[in-house]
Amino acid sequence: MIDKHGRNIDYLRISVTDRCNLRCIYCMPKMKGYIQENNKISCSDIFKLLRAAVSVGINKVRYTGGEPLLNEEISKIIYETSKLPQINDIAITTNGILLPQMAKDLKKAGLKRVNISLDTLKSDTFTKITNFNQITKVIDGIDTCLKLNLKPVKINTVLIKGINDLEVNDFVNLSREMPVEIRFIELMPIGEGAKIYEKGRVNIKELLMSRSDLIPIESLQNSTANMYKIKGGKGRIGYITPISCKFCSTCNKIRLTSMGTIKPCLHSNQEIDLKPYLNNEDVLVEKLKTIIFNKTFQHHINEENISRSKKMMYQIGG
């Protein structure tokens, strides 16, 4: 569906849980309660929303969390999604820890692509960022997805000054050896990330452009990443800068939180609760049409005195 700014909104990100098995320093506090089960949307609620979403032009779906693989019904959710003929792309964003034992079943259910969060290639730094020593499982998860041909396998790497910013070359070299897409992501001042943003933010473009061997390549339509490759490399490298160089004019997505609210913009405090409309498909469709048509043109997160999202990243499903 086309919004009032002329953008085709065809991409829905769905958070299926706010739970996670890591505690990344920019995302989730070490000690944190979760949404009560009776306040979450159920599997059947997700399907109701999906049916309404495809009727207004949604054709791409990504499942997020929290950690989406902690939702015991994730395979069922993906399978039911795959039965909708209008949906041509089903993906997940995961920390990868559970992929070694789950990836095969997820692909069988209909999963097409995987984004894996990995901020470091060093075990001690992984523990410092995530508060858990699980890097081996994540690496195994990447290998499993490559063997299953869940491609392109994208690795999301949030750069934090003084912690992992000196690993840029290590990740670039990884793209030389493996058929993966490395995507360096700007630290965002949301939730826990806001506490370390001023000291932790990195000029990703400047770091990458210090290399003379990067060859620019054309990005896909509506892609949020600026893409490059190395001559002879098996993979690709890119960077995503939603704060310093926002790409709102080509944004094509809306988000559904695990509480059943729609966020037209990740960085806005605006949320619309869809739970009251779940049992009336006609009303639900009309509500979605209104939300999409009125989607804000751009975020203002780097400006003062604006209405920022007050939720943590894991609650939003960023």
Swiss-Prot record:
Keywords: 4Fe-4S, GTP-binding, Iron, Iron-sulfur, Lyase, Metal-binding, Molybdenum cofactor biosynthesis, Nucleotide-binding, S-adenosyl-L-methionine. It catalyses: GTP + AH2 + S-adenosyl-L-methionine = (8S)-3',8-cyclo-7,8-dihydroguanosine 5'-triphosphate + 5'-deoxyadenosine + L-methionine + A + H(+). GO terms for biological process: Mo-molybdopterin cofactor biosynthetic process. GTP binds at R13, R62, T93, K154, K253, I254, R255. [4Fe-4S] cluster 1 binds at C20, C24, C27. Its cofactor is [4Fe-4S] cluster. Catalyzes the cyclization of GTP to (8S)-3',8-cyclo-7,8-dihydroguanosine 5'-triphosphate. Belongs to the radical SAM superfamily. MoaA family. NCBIfam families: moaA, PRK00164.2-1. Monomer and homodimer. This is GTP 3',8-cyclase. It comes from Clostridium acetobutylicum (strain ATCC 824 / DSM 792 / JCM 1419 / IAM 19013 / LMG 5710 / NBRC 13948 / NRRL B-527 / VKM B-1787 / 2291 / W). The gene is moaA.
